[in-house]
Amino acid sequence: MARPKSEDKKQALLEAATQAIAQSGIAASTAVIARNAGVAEGTLFRYFATKDELINTLYLHLKQDLCQSMIMELDRSITDAKMMTRFIWNSYISWGLNHPARHRAIRQLAVSEKLTKETEQRADDMFPELRDLCHRSVLMVFMSDEYRAFGDGLFLALAETTMDFAARDPARAGEYIALGFEAMWRALTREEQ
């Protein structure tokens, strides 16, 4: 009879995968992930049948953490798309600065070709306000299947640059975050907004 799965082991594997992917990208080996979680590699595959399943599960795990962080402070009375987008940008940057390994990992995962359509849909469903806001304000080309990953990559590159400068010079972090937002807004959204 198979032993029941432990939630603690699963969380340890997800945390080890976060660190490994943040450091080495999606090429991080399952052996390293398992070792850093304190389990045998075979144990990893009891929890995740394939590395792709681990990648998709980790993406959803990190996305849920990020979305919970953003939703926690969300003022749902804001109706202006630019103001709402600024709030989400600020929350995203704050989360990334407070959790740099998680941010590096989610960035690697978001632009990988390993995410399934189901995973992308589940991630979109976690924060419907964000999905709706994107449909209202993001250029339609970046909402298309063909260019969505490119648009995500642009957003993430601008966010990463903003985080790098904010972390290097905390006294000017607010200025960098505001300038980063304006650059992102002009690059990815419809001009009529």
Swiss-Prot record:
The keyword Calcium does not apply. Transcriptional regulator. Represses the transcription of the transcriptional activator RamA and, thereby, leads to repression of the expression of the efflux pump subunits AcrA and AcrB, and TolC. Acts by binding directly to the promoter region of the ramA gene. Promoter binding may be inhibited partially by the small regulatory RNA StyR3, perhaps thereby ensuring a basal level of expression of RamA. Residues 7-66 form the HTH tetR-type domain. Changing T18P: In BN18/21; significantly decreases susceptibility to quinolones, and to various antibiotics. Complementation with the wild-type ramR gene increases susceptibility to quinolones, and to various antibiotics. This is Transcriptional regulator RamR. Pfam families: TetR_N (PF00440). Binding of RamR to the promoter region of the ramA gene is significantly reduced as a result of deletions of various short sequences; deletion of two consecutive bases probably contributes to the multi-drug resistance phenotype of the BN10055 clinical isolate. RamR binds to various chemicals in vitro, including bile acids, such as cholic and chenodeoxycholic acids, and antimicrobial drugs, such as berberine, crystal violet, dequalinium, ethidium bromide and rhodamine 6G. Residues 29-48 bind DNA. Homodimer. May bind DNA either as a homodimer or as a pair of homodimers. Various chemicals reduce DNA-binding in vitro, including bile acids, such as cholic and chenodeoxycholic acids, and antimicrobial drugs, such as berberine, crystal violet, dequalinium, ethidium bromide and rhodamine 6G. Binds small regulatory RNA StyR3. Keywords: DNA-binding, Repressor, RNA-binding, Transcription, Transcription regulation. Disruption phenotype: Deletion results in a multi-drug resistance phenotype in the DT104 strain S/921495, with fourfold decreases in susceptibility to nalidixic acid, flumequine, enrofloxacin, ciprofloxacin, chloramphenicol, florfenicol, and tetracycline. Significant increases in expression of RamA, efflux pump subunits AcrA and AcrB, and TolC, in DT104 S/921495 and 14028s / SGSC 2262 strains. It comes from Salmonella typhimurium (strain LT2 / SGSC1412 / ATCC 700720). GO terms for molecular function: DNA binding; RNA binding. InterPro entries: DNA-bd_HTH_TetR-type_CS (IPR023772), Homeodomain-like_sf (IPR009057), HTH-type_TetR-like_transc_reg (IPR050109), HTH_TetR (IPR001647).
